[in-house]
Amino acid sequence: MGKKRKLDSKSPAAARSAAARAAAAAAAAAAAAAVAEPSSQPEALAEDPAPSSQPLGLSSEGAGERMMSREAGGGEEEEVEEVEVEEEVEVDEDEDGEGEGEEEEEAAERDADSIQALLNSFPKDQLVELLSAAALSHEDVLTAVHRAADADPALRKIFVHGLGWDATAETLTEAFSAYGEIEDLRVVTDRATGKCKGYGFILFSRRSGARAALREPQKKIGNRTTACQLASVGPVPPGGMATNPAPAVAPAPAQLALPPVSEYTQRKIFVSNVGADIDPQKLLQFFSKYGEIEEGPLGLDKVTGKPKGFALFVYKTLDSAKKALQEPHKQFEGVVLHCQKAIDGPKPNKGGGLGGLYGAGTSGGRKGAGGYGAHSHSLPGAAVGGHVMPSPVSSLTSLPGVAGGPGVNPALGQALTAILASQGGGLGLNNILGVGANGSGLPNPGASAGLGSSGLPGMPGAGGYLGGYGGGGGYGSTPPGGPGRNYMGH
């Protein structure tokens, strides 16, 4: 219960109390007047009304006191009611405080930072599922997804290969402008001749243009049948065409399996077409724009410190490596660098060299490691210090003097021909492989050192060009007890 209040003289309760006293006084006066009126009583009684009026006056005062008592009781009741009202108000205020706390918590759950932190804990598959459901249910979400896709050049840029040597930018414009507005295009040309190297890039303004162009990936451009794909996919997939002078990845045999990819390997990229005239520091600076580099460039010549046709970079984060691979073909000082994920290969053992595509590796015996398909554990690439060089590309013409040799798989000769036709000059493979300028297929002077041993192609036991075919050592074949080298002299 609350404390008793003293009634203010100006309050309604005080006014009611004063009115009650006035009414009691008026009643007493009326009673006195009635007694004073003439009656059958003696005149003496009329003259001296005091004895009879005194009791009346006392009773009037008693009535006034009783009324005041009732007024006081009413004041107490009013005070009790006011205390109860105050308690009810306090309870309502507590309930309002709890409601406000719930509203604040709900508002915090709708905060952008809170939602982002929550989504960061979700796996990618669950995020894709949630976003797909939201896009199907809400048109604005679907519009936002399409807008984000249109803003990404990786989804609008296509790579076309198999172009003729006379292809120009006008040739690509005429062939692809029908599919949508073209934002940019480029035909990659040879620096020496100015002729097309067989491939180019088209960047559409919208993703719909690229999708329309890729509905029919094979197109007749000029007198050539070409093929196109998204540039972000990476190297050309298997199944290149007979007239395709550009690179295409050779399909690996079904029995070959790659080892599990480590987290370190996922952060590593392989860059090809890196000539010896390229400054490694400038190359490092160029690839550092995609993220902080932990190691690289790896694969430099140990004597000269110059690139040997390729380079490896290891980024500190996986996101940086993915960013570097978003555009796998990069222009650097007038040269097109080809980037892709690196592959870790097995380390050499004491029993013999690694089984790579070119028989690369070291050997403690009389012969180098087996070549392509020589062992069931072989990997489709040449091993370079624990790294596996991505396998060379397939083309469809034979290497003169090699593909027709005894014990040589024609497909491998075709792959080597593709390298010579597309990138052999930039990588210096003509001299390394011992293919003369006249295309005879015979080694040039000094080519034997690059091959790891001397001998004629395909001759059993002589250490010819192709390890694993005809019983000879490969590029990694060595004299007894000597270390071998791969086809790039590493």
UniProtKB/Swiss-Prot annotation:
Gene3D superfamilies: 3.30.70.330. GO terms for molecular function: mRNA binding. The keyword Ubl conjugation does not apply. PROSITE patterns: RRM. Its main location: nucleus. Residues 13-36 have a biased composition (Low complexity). Keywords: Cytoplasm, Nucleus, Repeat, RNA-binding. GO terms for cellular component: cytoplasm; nucleus. The keyword Protein biosynthesis does not apply. It is found in: Nucleus; Cytoplasm. It comes from the Eukaryota. Residues 1-112 are annotated as: Disordered. GO terms for biological process: mRNA transport. Residues 74-108 have a biased composition (Acidic residues). Forms homodimers. Interacts with RBP-L and RBP-208. Interacts with NSF. This is RNA-binding protein P.
